[in-house]
Amino acid sequence: MPPLFISLEGIDGSGKSTQTARLVDWLRVRGRDPLQTREPGGSEGAEEIRRLLVEGDPDRWSAETEILLFTAARRDHLERTIRPALASGRDVVTDRFADSTRVYQGATRGALRGLVDRIHAEAIEAEPDLTLILDMDPELALSRGLARDSGEDRFEDFGLPFQQKLRAGFQALAREYPDRCHIVDASADPDAIAHTIQTIVGQRLAEA
C-alpha cells in the first residue's frame, strides 16, 4: 500500500495541531509509520524561517515577501523531510501545506493568488493526496486564542475580518479541489472531529 501525504488546513484556532496528532496516533495503531510535521517548519532551515513569519508585528512583512519566505521554508521542508519520508514508505501528516499560502497570502492579502501559483509551480509542484479543512466560525476560533499561548500570534493579530476572509478562502479551495479537499466541522466535539477525519482517511486507505 503506497504512503499517503495528508495535510490539515484551516483558520487560526481551528484545532489543526490537535487533530494532526490524533490522526498520527490513529494511523500508528493501524500498523502504519506516519511522520507528523508542520508548516512553516518541519526541517531545521524551515523552522528558522518560521520564527521570522509567525512572530512580531502584523505588518512586519509585505504579502509578496511572505510568499517568498513561505515558499523557501516549504522547499526545504519538502527536500529534507517530506520527500525522504514518502520515499521510505512512510505516511506524512502535516499541519498546513501550500493551501495555507494560497489562502493567507494569495486570496486575502492583495489578491496575489496568481503569483502564489506561479511560484508554487516552479519551486514546489507537490500537492497532498488528501487535504482536511477544519472549518469553524472565526469568532469561536479567535476566542480560543491557541496561538497566543506560544507567542506565535502574528496572523491572529490581523483580527476577525481577516479570519473571516480566510474561512471563505478555504471553503473556496474545497470547491476548487474537490477530489482531495474535504471540509470537516471543527466546531464539533474533538472526538467527533477525530472520528470524521478517521472515516475520511480510512476510505482513502481502502481505495489505495
UniProtKB/Swiss-Prot annotation:
Listed GO MF terms: ATP binding; dTMP kinase activity
InterPro entries on file: P-loop_NTPase, Thymidylate_kin-like_dom, Thymidylate_kin_CS, Thymidylate_kinase
GO biological process, one term: dUDP biosynthetic process
Presence of the UniProt keyword Plastid in the record: no
Domain of life: Bacteria
Disulfide bonds: none
Regions that span the bilayer: none
Binding sites annotated in the UniProt record for ATP: 10-17
Coiled coil regions in record: none
EC id: 2.7.4.9
SUPFAM superfamilies assigned: P-loop containing nucleoside triphosphate hydrolases (SSF52540)
Record-linked HAMAP family: Thymidylate_kinase
NCBIfam families registered for this protein in UniProt: DTMP_kinase
Record protein name field: Thymidylate kinase
Source taxonomy: Bacteria, Pseudomonadati, Pseudomonadota, Alphaproteobacteria, Rhodobacterales
